[in-house]
């Protein structure tokens, strides 16, 4: 027999009927509907919220909030955008010391990273610990050079 669209049927047992609870004991889920006799879990409005421990102070409230938790191996940088480097003259060398003298960096606590925001109009020799791809491209397009410093 060939099957056509009007004769298609689903396999037996593949479509289960919905359990109708509370519709008599013959259905198997009558009276207490499978929730047992008494107690909080048999009442209406159930279930309790996630993390509820029966009135005891829950774990997520017992444990202190860890504020100012330091990320392990996090790399911090002193960052400078390219537009700030326009304060220098042509063929100047830009490094942490020259940036401190100009007042662009206050405390040379972290390694220097050059970001590519803005345009650069001067030819500079930039010495930094890290460059973004865009920053390196823009410095070299302006006729300058980028030199990576090793920080140990």
Swiss-Prot record:
In the UniProt record, does the keyword Protein transport occur? Answer: no
Record's family?
Belongs to the universal ribosomal protein uL15 family.
Q: Which named protein is this? A: Large ribosomal subunit protein uL15
| Keywords linked to the UniProt accession | Ribonucleoprotein, Ribosomal protein, RNA-binding, rRNA-binding
Gene Ontology molecular functions: rRNA binding; structural constituent of ribosome
Q: Where does the record place the region Disordered?
A: 1-57
Q: Name one Pfam family in it.
A: Ribosomal_L27A
What organism is listed for this UniProt entry? Prochlorococcus marinus (strain AS9601)
Kindly give the InterPro entries that the UniProt entry links to this protein.
Ribosomal_uL15 (IPR030878), Ribosomal_uL15/eL18 (IPR021131), Ribosomal_uL15/eL18_sf (IPR036227), Ribosomal_uL15_bac-type (IPR005749), Ribosomal_uL15_CS (IPR001196)
The protein's matches in NCBIfam families, at most eight in alphabetical order, are given as: rplO_bact
Q: Briefly, what is this protein's role? A: Binds to the 23S rRNA.
Fill in the subunit field for this protein: Part of the 50S ribosomal subunit.
Q: Which GO terms describe its cellular component?
A: cytosolic large ribosomal subunit
Question: This protein's superkingdom?
Answer: Bacteria
Q: List the PROSITE patterns.
A: RIBOSOMAL_L15 (PS00475)
Q: Name one GO biological process term.
A: translation
Q: By its UniProt entry, which HAMAP family does this protein fall under?
A: Ribosomal_uL15 (MF_01341)
Question: Biased-composition ranges for Basic residues?
Answer: 14-23
Biased composition regions of type Gly residues, renumbered to the chain: 25-37
């Amino acid at each position: 027999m060939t099957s056509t669209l009007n004769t298609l049927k689903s396999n037996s047992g593949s479509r289960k009927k919905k359990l109708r609870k509370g519709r008599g004991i013959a259905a198997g889920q009558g009276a207490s509907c499978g929730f047992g006799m008494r107690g909080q879990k048999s009442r209406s409005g159930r279930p309790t919220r996630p993390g509820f421990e029966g009135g005891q102070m829950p774990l997520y409230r017992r444990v202190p909030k860890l504020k100012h938790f330091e990320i392990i191996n996090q790399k911090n940088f002193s960052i400078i955008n390219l537009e700030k480097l326009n304060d220098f003259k042509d063929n100047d060398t830009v490094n942490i010391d020259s940036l401190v003298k100009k007042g662009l960096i206050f405390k040379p606590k972290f390694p220097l990273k050059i970001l590519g925001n803005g345009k650069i109009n001067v030819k500079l020799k930039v010495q930094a610990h890290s460059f973004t791809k865009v920053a390196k491209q823009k410095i070299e397009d302006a006729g300058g050079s980028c030199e990576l410093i090793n920080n140990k």
